[in-house]
Amino acid sequence: MKAHPVSLVAVLACMFFALVLCSHGQEKRQFVESRVSIKTSLPPGARLKEAKILSLQELSALPDPPGVEKNDTRYERTRIPAFPNPLGVKEGDVVTVSGWLHVVRLMGDGDYHLRFSPTADSVDHYLVSEIPDEDDVPPQLRPMIEAARNFVKSKVLAGKEPSRQEATLPNPLYIQITGQLFFNDVSAGDDSRPDAQGLHRASRWEVHPGLVLAFSKQ
């Protein structure tokens, strides 16, 4: 008995999409990260309405938490404790920061990687925020994550998905982002060196997960 042409096309289409989904899953599994459970969640009781407003310059000047080592296993599933600092903040606090968004990139783990700087004419001395994949966050955060990612696609990238290739926006946008203050210990203790593009990261502190984005006035 011959296969019906329409049925054959449907089967082939299903096989194609299954391969795409499988490939995406394998890629994410191969992308090894640290502190995933911390940077894809909020502490119990955290409220976005009580976010502390910080300038990009203030956050850039926030010192590293003392005693934290590179890829510190003590904090793989635990937030870094509070320490004395001029801003009175700690990892896990909800913060709101505004700056010029210069770079949007899709990472191997599905995160949207954003780079903000204090000026419109340069991405140098940037701060990082990342918006996780919806599948990687607790159910209560998924609506916010979906809205944040949709903002990036619709308001920043004209309806397109971010590229996996690092690209600078032709017209930087002044944007306010609210999310968790997170310390990226992957490079803790390393000297501050420029990246492959000759640009400097202003701080190891990030807004991660980034949850709410909006256009802002300077």
Over which residues does each language-model region extend?
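Bacterial N-terminal signal peptides that target proteins for export
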Residues: 1-10
